[in-house]
Amino acid sequence: MKQQAWIPALALALCGTAQAQSNEELKAKLDQALKTIEDLQSRVQALEQQKPAAAPAPAPAAAPAAGTWGAPVVSVGTRAEDAKTPDADKARVEVYGQVMLDSIYDFKRMDPDWNATLRPSKIPVVCPGSAGCGEDGAWVFSARQSSLGLRSFIPTSFGLVKTDLSFDLFGSDGSTSIHWLSIWAELGMFGVGQTYSNFMDIDVFPNTIDYWGPSGMVFVRNPQLRITPWSKDGASLAFALEAPNSALDTGKISDISPDFGAGFTGWNRLPDLTGSLRYDADWGHVKAAGILRQVGYQNTLTADNKPSGHETGYGLNLTGSLKVAGKDKLVGAFAWGKAIASYMNDGGVDLAPGDGLRAETVQSIGWLAYYNHVWAENWSSAIGFSQHIQDNTAGQTATAFRRGSYGNVNLLYTPWKNVLTGLEFVWGELEQKDGQSATDYRLQFSTKVTF
């Protein structure tokens, strides 16, 4: 009833108002009201659109950019064997090395340029007249075994490029100076630069602290081009062209004519060809390596460089290791050949005068046998012996190298992972063609910190 009462009243009021105002005024008011309503509707819609939205799903992580030569991702202070699964598509660099001090008491004598290690070929036999002659006994301190290296791993569209640059401080003139060890790069089956010869096996080097090591071991770091065309199930086959070197002994030629003998130098026309076959298993490993080379000579003090010529050298190196009780290991090697002294660790020559003072290749035999024993978690020892023997030619002098013998025994302690210290007894002997010989023996205490 109340609703029916106010509707007629409202109609009468509107009619009165309409009569009091002109049509134009009424139209303007209606337009303004409509505009106000539209503004209110727009504001309501805007408020509704400002409600909290659901959190968007996180975007997937972008794949790391491929490594490039110009912008490597660097990981410094990590060794290859300790590295944690780095990103496969990022280049990285690893710094490694060691700080090492050798404290040596030499009971006898050694060529002063080599007194920081024991090389049988550098033991003075005839005194006076040989380098190292003098009173017995000397203390030697040396940091020359300290080394520094840099490895890099660079992804490319052709595969992973690996490089290795390293040096120690064992200068050949007795100084503490840079001595390059490795300058190497490899991609897949191909390798170039300087590294261990394909003819040698570094895995038979014993657990000793003397720098030079067994005299009868094939050991040389050589510039080379290498290919490993086959590697499967622990077996690998490798070939290399290596830098040639002719180690000459002018022998009795220099006795007859010192000036004439002084003119002879090596003449290397072809690279050395080496090949190796290796097999690794749970029990150890075996390796067979061979070499074929041309060694030559010439006289640079004559007008026509005569006499000159070449001879063929060849050799075989058989090496291996055998795991025995616990963590113990037996390592051994046997090498034989003609004109392979350039590849032996110590002593000998490739070419020397023979009958009628004509050039002949000199035969070498080298061998080593060492036993590496682990006493406890932090204690270990090595004991062994090695020899390099040459079959001297008729034209070599009485003082020519005939045999170098080498042996050592030690006790080593590793208190922490990267620290090693120990005491080693080292013995060596040099025997000449005429049968004269001399020995040297020493005690060496060393401390090494690797990183």
Regions found by a protein language model. Name each.
Residues 1-7:
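Bacterial N-terminal signal peptides that target proteins for export
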Residues 106, 155, 168-174, 197-201, ...:
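Sequence/structural signature of outer-membrane beta-barrel proteins
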Residues 16-20:
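Sec/Tat signal peptide C-region and signal peptidase I cleavage site
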Residues 280-401:
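Detector for outer-membrane/organellar transmembrane beta-barrel domains
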Residues 21-114:
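N-terminal periplasmic/intermembrane-space "pro-region" immediately following the signal or transit peptide
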